[in-house]
From Swiss-Prot:
It holds the Pfam family Aminotran_1_2. The keyword NADP does not apply. This is Histidinol-phosphate aminotransferase. CDD domains: AAT_like. GO terms for molecular function: histidinol-phosphate transaminase activity; pyridoxal phosphate binding. NCBIfam families: hisC. The keyword Transferase applies. GO terms for biological process: L-histidine biosynthetic process. Pathway: Amino-acid biosynthesis; L-histidine biosynthesis; L-histidine from 5-phospho-alpha-D-ribose 1-diphosphate: step 7/9. It catalyses: L-histidinol phosphate + 2-oxoglutarate = 3-(imidazol-4-yl)-2-oxopropyl phosphate + L-glutamate. Keywords: Amino-acid biosynthesis, Aminotransferase, Histidine biosynthesis, Pyridoxal phosphate, Transferase. Its EC number is 2.6.1.9. SUPFAM superfamilies: PLP-dependent transferases.
Amino acid sequence: MKFNKHLQNIKTYEAGKPIELVVREYGIEPQDIVKLASNENPLGCSPKVIDAVGKILTKMSLYPDDSMISLKNALSKRYNVDSENVIIGSGSDQVIEFLIHAKAHSGSKILMNSITFAMYEIYSKHVGADVIRTSSQEHDLDEFYELYKQEKPEIIFICTPNNPTGDALDAQKIYNFLEKIDNDTLVVVDAAYMEYAIVKDAKKEINVKELIQKHSNVIYLGTFSKAYGLGGMRVGYGISEAKIIKELYKLRPPFNITTLSLEAATVALSDEEFVQKSTALNLEQMKRYEEFAKEQKIDIINSYTNFVTLSLGSNQNSTKIASQLLQNGMIVRDLSSYNMNAIRVTIGTQEQNSRFFKLVIKFL
């Protein structure tokens, strides 16, 4: 049987191992496993969300409100934009998929950082586009601009804060870069971890309203999977000029967000106290990782997210260490697939982080 020829060059995306799989593979009891691999909120989600979702369980037999008007209005209010500027996806990665299918085709060029979110490349290959990468690990917008002039890409991806490294750009640098890009090149600003970044450094915050008013070729992406603690609900969004959103809607399948997910995201957005609690805990515990890395003489990338990336020495192997941790009930992310001898560790609770420190020392 023949399949789309572009699939031959695509590797399946491997998400962080779920706890259930570790239970089956290693026979470790669930309560003895700590998952610090997928950048989930260690506090879970807002109690208000749990209460609200519980009250609508009887509606599961009904299709959701496909207009998603309550959530769109809530996001519009949060960012001070019109609802016509908002599209909701099953995770922000679905919006990324829409964008690439809407703008790129076989032979198109798509520009991204050398190390960044893997789904940009995977979706690019869906349509047979050519991926152009920078040479630097961190987002060097001067290099981005030089490659933009040389390659004339259809789409540019800027991931800030970046996954899986955690570094972030000052908003002003992004604004300056956008001034030099023509209106026919789509620029995607993926800000999945922005709630964490702005707590650490206010200079990272992007004024979304001004962004889309000044630039008709830009879309801003956000998600409920991280600071809001709704990774299992799969809700993300894009904010852009109404004309772009209208085109993306042509690719959106009906009822792509469930009734429970819509309710959860809408309520989560209203509970600012929970997000503040989550980001405060994250910043507090991040300092412990920075101190630990200094004590152990491990290179740590300055992170503006809810994870840290620990770069290992030449006498260490990230795959081996991640495997040793896994066998002891500690799930972290090996970054060897990004050509990095490093592990990415989600910042957990105080207890979870203490357990990681105590365990990883044995294998360093």
